[in-house]
């Protein structure tokens, strides 16, 4: 259980980093980064890693 959660959090961080880099290349605004931080916090609070990772892939 713990290892699955750790892997999920690492994957989530990777998606987050990639997404922020992509957004900063297209539109470097603090608002975008703030939205992504809120989404990430929501994902961690709900421990809904699958939904968040799917969201990041589709984004």
UniProtKB/Swiss-Prot annotation:
Gene Ontology cellular component annotations, sorted alphabetically: extracellular region
Signal peptide segment: 1-18
Keywords: Secreted, Signal
Keyword Coiled coil found: no
Family (UniProt): Belongs to the non-disulfide-bridged peptide (NDBP) superfamily. Long chain multifunctional peptide (group 2) family.
Tissue-specificity statement: Expressed by the venom gland.
Localization annotation: Secreted
Name recorded for this polypeptide: Venom protein 37.1
ATP-binding among keywords: no
């Amino acid at each position: 259980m713990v290892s699955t959660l750790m892997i999920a959090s690492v994957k989530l961080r990777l998606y987050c980093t990639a997404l922020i880099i992509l957004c900063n290349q297209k539109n470097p605004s603090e608002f975008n980064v703030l939205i992504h931080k809120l989404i990430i916090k929501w994902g961690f609070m709900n421990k809904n890693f699958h939904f968040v990772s799917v969201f990041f892939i589709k984004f």
